[in-house]
C-alpha cells in the first residue's frame, strides 16, 4: 500500500496585511509538511467580497516569498487541484450544496436581516445563546415550515440563504494533534449558513469542500477556529468523507497576556519589514511563538532549514504564546553578528547612495562607498547596531562630517586647556606615516603622559569632534577607518565650533 502524500495549506483572505499570526500559521504548515517531504499549498479564500482589499493578494504572496515560505501550488504556480482562488470555484460549491439539499442536510432560509436581529435580541434578553430559530426549517426535515410556503418564496424570487441542518443532541468529537480529545454538544451549534444570498459560499462550507477536494491530510490553523470544528466535522459526515487531521495553534498574546492586537503594537508583518527586521529573524522568532525544540537544547537561533528538520507538532504548546519584541530584537542582533559583510553591504550600499544624493559629504565618495571601506565600518559596528540600516543611520559620521556636537558631552569633557591640547595633538597626527589604531593610541598616550594627564583627557574630546557624539566603537579604530585627512579636518573645524558650547 502506497503511503498517502502529506499535504497542508495556508488559506488567507485578501483583506489587507498579513498578520504575524497568519505568518506563524503559514510557517508551521510549511515546516510540518516539508519535514514529511510533502506539498505546501497556498489557497486564497475570497468569498467575503465586502472585505476584499485591492492588492492584498499580491502583498500576501510577496510577504510569504520574503519569508522564504514558498508554496508548491498556488494561484500563480497552478497545480493539479486548482483553481486556487475560491471565487473561481463557485460552480463546485453549488454542486455540493445541491447534494446537501437533496440529502435533507440543508435547507432554504428566507429570513430577513431584521427578523434575524429581532430573534437575536430576544434570545439575549432570555439569557440564551443566540442561534437561528429554524423558522424556515421544512416540515419534512422536522421543522414547521410547509413546503408550499417555501415554493411560494422561490416563485417570487425572494432572496435566501442555504443553511445546514445540525442534528439535535449528538456529540461531535475529534482528536486535536495539539490539544488531544475535544468534544462538542450539537445543541450549542447554530444552523450555519452555507451559501449566502449573493451565491457565494461561507468560509465554513467552502473550506471543507476545498480541503477535501485538494486532498489535504492535515489542517493546521489558529485556536480561533476551534469553535467552528463541529460544523466542519458534520459537513464531512454529511458527505461521507474522511476528515483530515486537525491541529489548532495557541493564541498570540501581548506581554500582559491580552490577545495580540494593533492597539498594543504592530501586528502586520509588513510593519516589521519596514522597520528593518530581516526575514531570518522574523521567521526564527515566529517559529518559537508556541513551539520549542524541547528539554536538553539551548539553541535559540535557527535557520529555516534547521526549523524544517526539527519542527514537530508534538512540541507545540496549548497555552497562549507571548509576543515579546525584546526577544525579536535580540534575534535580529544575533543574525547581524553572524551575517557576512557582503550580504550587509548589499543592503546598506543603496541606503548610503540615497543619503549621498540628499546631502553633501566632505569625504571621498569613491572611498566611503567602496566595499573595503564598508567592511571596516561593519566590523566596527556589528556589536552596536540593531538593524542593518543602522550601519548608516546610527553611525553617519563614517560618511558625513558632523554638523552638530553633543552639548552635554562638550560641557562634561571640555576644560580650559582642551582646545589647546587638541591643536597640539593635530600636529602629532599629521606627522604620522602609518595612520593606524595602534600608532594613534601610542602617540596619544605619549602626548598626555608628560603633561600629567590621563588618556581620557583627549579620548572623549576627539570622539565628539570626529563623530559628533560621546559614544561609539573604539576611538582608535574609528579614527583609523575615517582616515588622516578626515580626522584632521574634523578636529580643526570642531575646535572652532565647541568654543561656543564649552
Curated annotation (Swiss-Prot):
Name the UniProt record assigns to this protein: Glutamate--tRNA ligase
Gene behind this protein: gltX
Similarity field: Belongs to the class-I aminoacyl-tRNA synthetase family. Glutamate--tRNA ligase type 1 subfamily.
Places the protein is found: Cytoplasm
UniProt motif 'HIGH' region: location: 12-22
PROSITE patterns reported in the protein's UniProt record: AA_TRNA_LIGASE_I
EC number: 6.1.1.17
Motif 'KMSKS' region mapped to chain: 259-263
Binding-site residues for ATP, renumbered to this chain: 262
Amino acid at each position: 500500500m502506497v503511503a498517502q502524500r502529506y499535504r497542508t495549506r495556508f488559506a488567507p483572505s485578501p483583506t489587507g496585511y498579513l498578520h504575524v499570526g497568519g505568518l506563524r500559521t503559514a510557517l508551521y504548515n510549511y515546516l510540518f509538511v516539508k519535514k514529511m517531504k510533502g506539498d505546501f499549498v497556498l489557497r486564497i479564500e475570497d468569498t467575503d467580497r465586502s472585505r476584499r482589499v485591492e492588492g492584498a493578494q499580491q502583498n500576501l504572496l510577496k510577504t510569504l516569498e520574503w519569508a522564504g515560505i514558498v508554496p508548491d501550488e498556488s494561484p500563480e504556480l497552478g497545480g493539479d487541484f486548482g483553481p486556487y482562488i475560491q471565487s473561481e470555484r463557485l460552480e463546485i460549491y453549488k454542486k455540493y450544496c445541491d447534494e446537501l439539499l437533496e440529502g435533507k442536510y440543508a435547507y432554504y432560509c428566507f429570513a430577513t436581516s431584521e427578523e434575524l436581529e429581532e430573534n437575536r435580541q430576544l434570545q439575549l434578553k432570555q439569557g440564551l445563546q443566540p442561534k437561528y430559530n429554524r423558522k424556515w426549517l421544512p416540515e419534512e426535515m422536522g421543522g414547521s415550515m410547509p413546503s408550499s410556503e417555501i415554493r411560494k418564496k422561490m416563485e417570487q424570487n425572494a432572496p435566501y440563504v442555504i443553511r445546514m441542518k445540525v442534528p439535535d443532541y449528538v456529540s461531535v468529537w475529534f482528536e486535536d494533534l495539539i490539544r488531544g480529545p475535544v468534544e462538542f454538544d450539537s445543541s450549542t451549534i447554530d444552523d450555519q449558513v452555507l451559501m449566502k444570498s449573493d451565491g457565494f459560499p461561507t468560509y465554513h462550507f467552502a473550506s471543507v469542500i476545498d480541503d477535501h477536494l485538494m486532498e489535504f491530510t492535515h489542517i493546521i490553523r489558529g485556536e480561533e477556529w476551534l469553535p467552528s470544528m463541529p460544523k466542519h466535522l458534520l459537513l464531512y459526515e454529511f458527505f461521507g468523507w474522511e476528515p483530515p487531521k486537525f491541529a489548532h495553534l495557541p493564541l498570540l498574546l501581548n506581554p500582559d497576556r491580552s490577545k495580540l492586537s494593533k492597539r498594543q503594537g504592530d501586528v502586520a508583518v509588513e510593519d516589521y519589514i519596514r522597520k528593518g527586521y530581516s526575514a531570518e529573524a522574523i521567521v526564527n522568532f515566529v517559529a518559537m511563538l508556541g513551539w520549542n525544540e524541547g528539554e536538553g537544547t539551548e539553541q535559540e537561533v535557527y535557520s529555516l532549514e534547521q526549523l524544517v528538520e526539527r519542527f514537530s507538532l508534538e512540541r507545540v504548546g496549548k497555552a497562549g504564546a507571548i509576543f515579546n519584541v525584546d526577544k525579536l530584537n535580540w534575534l535580529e542582533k544575533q543574525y547581524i553578528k553572524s551575517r557576512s559583510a557582503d550580504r550587509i553591504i548589499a543592503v546598506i550600499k543603496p541606503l548610503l547612495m540615497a543619503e549621498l544624493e540628499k546631502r553633501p559629504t566632505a569625504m571621498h565618495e569613491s572611498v566611503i562607498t567602496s566595499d573595503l571601506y564598508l567592511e571596516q565600518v561593519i566590523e566596527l559596528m556589528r556589536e552596536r547596531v540593531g538593524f542593518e540600516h543602522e550601519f548608516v543611520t546610527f553611525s553617519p559620521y563614517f560618511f558625513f562630517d558632523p554638523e552638530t556636537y553633543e552639548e552635554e558631552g562638550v560641557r562634561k569633557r571640555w576644560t580650559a586647556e582642551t582646545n589647546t591640547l587638541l591643536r597640539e595633538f593635530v600636529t602629532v597626527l599629521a606627522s604620522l606615516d602609518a595612520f593606524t589604531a595602534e600608532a594613534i593610541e601610542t602617540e596619544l598616550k605619549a602626548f598626555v603622559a608628560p603633561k600629567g594627564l590621563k588618556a581620557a583627557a583627549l579620548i572623549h574630546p576627539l570622539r565628539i569632534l570626529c563623530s559628533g557624539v560621546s559614544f561609539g566603537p573604539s576611538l582608535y579604530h574609528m579614527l583609523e577607518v575615517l582616515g588622516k585627512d578626515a580626522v584632521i579636518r574634523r578636529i580643526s573645524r570642531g575646535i572652532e565650533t565647541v568654543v561656543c558650547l564649552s
